[in-house]
């Protein structure tokens, strides 16, 4: 097997140093690791051989740049392979998102939104037994949205249902769903739906 380890000084003033924070898979749990195909494994080994060959070359003013670029190339391939893995695990990912939706529904029904506390990435990741970074990447890959954006739309759908039900005023909907004020809720609703909450209720009845 292979182990790649490098000193942080290698990152200084390099493209890898500027981009290392973008490789979110460094924060994944062990059970979220890559499952490489044979072709992907060959490509990863090729990258490692290139790094090894450069390390065996006499050190000169280009060594640091070339080694860091080879490492960055390997990490870029890993990003590509993770995208492939997300695609091939489509059904598994859908099941995970269904569990997330159930958890978010429960969070809304619990009344915690009244205190203005929105569900966090860690909250959802813990329920799903995932690392926060893996959960965020999965959600972004499947929906194109981060948790705040996704929950914003989900909360809006719940607001629509409440407006069409009996016993809820616009004010009570805004309060139950944790919006900071009725005016904020009304303005946001109009922006996203195209009509005010009252107009929406009238148009559907």
What are these regions (language model features)?
Residues 96-148, 166-175:
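DNA-binding recognition helix and immediately preceding turn/loop
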Residues 1-57:
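A hydrophobic/aromatic-rich effector-binding and dimerization subdomain
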Residues 8, 132-133, 181-183:
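The DNA-contacting recognition helix of HTH DNA-binding domains
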Residues 186-205:
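…primarily DNA-binding HTH/wHTH and HhH modules…
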Residues 141-183, 202-205:
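Terminal helix-turn-helix DNA-binding modules in bacterial transcription factors
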Residues 42-91, 95-102:
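An amphipathic alpha-helical interaction segment
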């Amino acid at each position: 097997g292979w182990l790649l380890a490098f000193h942080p000084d290698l990152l200084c003033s390099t493209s890898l140093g500027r981009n290392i924070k973008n490789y979110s898979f460094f924060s994944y749990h062990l059970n979220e690791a890559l499952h490489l195909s044979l072709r992907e494994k060959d490509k990863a080994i090729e990258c490692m051989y290139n790094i090894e060959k450069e390390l065996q070359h006499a050190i000169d003013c280009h060594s640091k740049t070339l080694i860091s670029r080879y490492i960055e190339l390997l990490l870029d391939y890993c990003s590509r392979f993770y995208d492939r893995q997300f695609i091939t695990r489509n059904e598994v990912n859908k099941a995970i998102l269904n569990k997330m939706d159930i958890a978010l529904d429960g969070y809304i029904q619990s009344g915690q939104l009244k205190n203005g506390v929105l569900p966090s990435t860690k909250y959802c990741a813990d329920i799903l037994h995932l690392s926060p970074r893996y959960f965020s990447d999965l959600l972004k890959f499947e929906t194109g949205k981060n948790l705040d954006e996704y929950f914003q739309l989900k909360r809006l759908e719940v607001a629509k249902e409440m407006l069409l039900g009996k016993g809820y005023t616009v004010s009570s909907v805004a309060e139950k769903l944790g919006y900071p004020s009725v005016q904020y809720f009304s303005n946001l609703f109009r922006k996203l739906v195209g009509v005010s909450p009252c107009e929406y209720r009238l148009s559907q009845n």
